[in-house]
């Protein structure tokens, strides 16, 4: 017999007939089975619907995203737009051709001159106008200046919403000094109203080119500083690499253009593929990404700002004195001495102001490589002083429509940099 004693001196050896001796364990009761099954069953989760917008600080405009979440994972997304719809196309059909320019300013208001240029190119095709050389160069210069402004806005906002507030301050400071130069040229910092059918509104003030070159030097310093702060920052890279991925084939299928398409590996740029104005005389490179993710889209903007700097400086070197608008007073207001000194000048001025320019009947499509991609204007004229029909191809809409494709299956925290990287501008998308 085992003499071992348990606690309290009790004999720990089981005797025949005692509990647990010589018999199998008894079956678990219903409560025990339920407890055992709960341990084996997966954790239950409940889907949650979250509204982002329409007045959310990260949405960059009044856009609403209805996101269905499984924990932190996005399971589905629906976009709700139209909060900023102003009837752009119909409004333009009720004013003269020249009066359309302020409406185009309010599409992508961060780079408004590009909108002016695209509309002017479409109307000039119908009128068969050949714009003077200096006007072409001024259009390119101002468009590229506004491209830098647009990209600085994206770079600053995207970095800020990932925690890099310093980058935002640098970007806004750089953009602010560029707006100072635009205000000197156009009279306005944001909505420029600089475009005109047949040319541009005004020539450069004395010393403006030299001041702009010095401004570009300062902006280049800011861009280099931003590059050092975030492009090799481990946190920034981890948050942007591999998120919001759009492969090349899908980007083409979804209708991407501009930096978002090039970030996916497709080297398509209208300034090279279908040159307009004087882009065929300018030497510049087209940056192309490889992964099509948020990091590549960020880097596209960084490099494009440097290329825009190259383009502007080459335009300054090539540009010569000359007219800034065609001297056809059916389309351009005559100079004041002619208006006040001749009956022909007075009549031409009166007809343009009261009736608008008379655009030959027909239809045309004008395009530009805007900051976000291909910006297109389809115009139809019945021979009168107002557009019969105007259609807009907004570059931001295909990217916004693809946001569910880019975000479903990823984390909620990745949605914000993905949204930033497409640079959705509400005025352009919702018109």
UniProtKB/Swiss-Prot annotation:
Keywords: Cell inner membrane, Cell membrane, Membrane, NAD, Quinone, Translocase, Transport, Ubiquinone. It is a peripheral membrane protein. It comes from the Bacteria. Its main location: membrane. GO terms for cellular component: plasma membrane. It catalyses: a quinone + NADH + 5 H(+)(in) = a quinol + NAD(+) + 4 H(+)(out). Its EC number is 7.1.1.-. It is found in: Cell inner membrane. SUPFAM superfamilies: HydB/Nqo4-like. Residues 1-27 are annotated as: Disordered. One of its GO terms (molecular function) is NAD binding. NDH-1 is composed of 14 different subunits. Subunits NuoB, C, D, E, F, and G constitute the peripheral sector of the complex. Belongs to the complex I 49 kDa subunit family. NDH-1 shuttles electrons from NADH, via FMN and iron-sulfur (Fe-S) centers, to quinones in the respiratory chain. The immediate electron acceptor for the enzyme in this species is believed to be ubiquinone. Couples the redox reaction to proton translocation (for every two electrons transferred, four hydrogen ions are translocated across the cytoplasmic membrane), and thus conserves the redox energy in a proton gradient. This is NADH-quinone oxidoreductase subunit D 2. It comes from Anaeromyxobacter sp. (strain Fw109-5). The gene is nuoD2.
